[in-house]
């Protein structure tokens, strides 16, 4: 089913009108797809403040080789706008854990598994746990600056206990600004912290519009910290894995990449020269070549 009502075509940034997949619990998942049905499937998982539109730099070029599928996770645009963030019969809680199961059921609903999965930032963490929890659905895995802390000896597994205090304080301030109506300032604080100072001010209009559309998810996300990566979980990843970071990515992402490179059997790491956290946008050509080449190489 195509989704047309309730969405201004200009909000799609030139992407095709999204389809809707209705899962077995009634949850409706908006997604866009490019390429052809007979092509191998590549599933893209967005991160914080984003939705399927984040993958525009990939959905066009990579459609020459793959059937590219990019869903918007529940609560993210346009799900909230159209009332799709809730299951039939009740509200759906925002959580990374629910998003993992949601993606698993989404792949099963499409009947296309196993698929090649690409996840960025928070979406990288969700994609990682998708591969751990549903190994039969993931053919290969690409993690780009995966979000989440790295477990240390003595940690109890809760990500909130291992994130540095300054990061938690900054995130609380960003949520406070957004909640008080100073959305632009809150987004600037958060986005610059996960990329580089000044990144928000230099961001394209489309990225800013997308972040504004998803600003309400930030406070929900901060109340649901990502789990810390550990060797035990990483050892359960059974598929070929490519891990990408940017030369200028913040340390918290590079730390996660370094740990996962050592823990995931056979994982390959590539650093994109000159790139920071938004590598698939700012260095789309290099990113696309890596992603396309990873599937061929595997």
Kindly label every feature range from the protein language model:
Residues 23-89, 106:
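Conserved HGGG/HGGXW glycine-rich cap/lid loop of the alpha/beta-hydrolase fold
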Residues 128, 132-133, 137-178:
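Flexible "cap/lid" loop of the alpha/beta hydrolase fold
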Residues 119, 123, 127:
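Gly/Ala-rich beta-loop-alpha elbow adjacent to hydrolase catalytic centers
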Residues 265-298:
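Catalytic active-site module of serine/aspartate enzymes centered on a nucleophile-bearing elbow/loop
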């Amino acid at each position: 089913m195509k989704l047309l009502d309730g969405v201004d075509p200009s909000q799609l940034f030139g992407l095709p009108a999204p389809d809707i997949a209705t899962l077995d619990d009634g949850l409706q998942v908006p997604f866009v797809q490019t390429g052809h049905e007979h092509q191998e499937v590549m599933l893209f998982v967005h991160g914080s403040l984003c939705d399927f539109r984040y993958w525009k730099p990939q959905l066009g070029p990579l459609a020459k080789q793959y059937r590219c599928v990019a869903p918007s996770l529940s609560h993210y645009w346009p799900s909230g706008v159209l009332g799709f963030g809730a299951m039939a019969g009740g509200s759906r809680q925002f959580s990374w854990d629910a998003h993992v199961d949601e993606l698993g059921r989404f792949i099963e609903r499409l009947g296309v598994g196993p698929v090649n999965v690409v996840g960025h930032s928070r979406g990288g963490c969700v994609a990682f746990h998708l591969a751990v929890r549903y190994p039969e659905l993931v053919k290969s895995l690409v993690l780009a600056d995966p979000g989440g802390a790295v477990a240390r000896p003595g940690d109890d597994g809760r990500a909130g206990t291992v994130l540095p205090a300054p990061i938690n304080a900054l995130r609380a301030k960003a949520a406070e600004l957004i909640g008080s109506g100073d959305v632009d300032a809150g987004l600037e604080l958060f986005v610059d912290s996960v990329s580089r100072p000044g990144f928000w001010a230099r961001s394209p209009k489309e990225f800013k519009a997308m972040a504004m559309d998803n600003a309400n998810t930030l406070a929900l996300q901060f109340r649901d910290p990502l789990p810390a990566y550990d060797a035990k979980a990483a050892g359960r990843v059974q598929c070929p894995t490519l891990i990408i970071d940017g030369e200028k990515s913040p340390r918290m992402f590079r730390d996660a990449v370094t740990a996962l490179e050592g823990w995931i059997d056979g994982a390959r790491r590539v650093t994109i020269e000159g790139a920071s956290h938004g590598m698939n946008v700012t260095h789309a050509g290099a990113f696309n070549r890596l992603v396309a080449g990873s599937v061929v190489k595997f």
